[in-house]
């Protein structure tokens, strides 16, 4: 089952999410928006199992990578379900 994986421009290009993903959903691609010159990309979302290890590994305060498992997950992540 695939899930929606969003990469935000707060990504610092550290590769932590890529290394944490057990199914190789993520990869780094060139990007001029940060010092590292790269940003995470999710070309293989059909392989995402929803483990959210990428989110846990992300060192940014804004969780630059997010995995949305469905409608409830999306509203919860926005703080709307509480």
From Swiss-Prot:
Lineage of the source organism?
A: Eukaryota, Sar, Stramenopiles, Ochrophyta, Bacillariophyta
Bound cofactor: record note: Binds 2 [4Fe-4S] clusters. Cluster 2 is most probably the spectroscopically characterized electron acceptor FA and cluster 1 is most probably FB.
Q: What is its EC number?
A: 1.97.1.12
Complexes and interactors: The eukaryotic PSI reaction center is composed of at least 11 subunits.
The top EC class is: oxidoreductase
What topology does the record note for this protein and the membrane? Peripheral membrane protein
State the Gene Ontology terms under molecular function: 4 iron, 4 sulfur cluster binding; electron transfer activity; metal ion binding; oxidoreductase activity
**Catalyzed reactions:** reduced [plastocyanin] + hnu + oxidized [2Fe-2S]-[ferredoxin] = oxidized [plastocyanin] + reduced [2Fe-2S]-[ferredoxin]
Protein name, UniProt field: Photosystem I iron-sulfur center
**Disulfide bridge map:** none
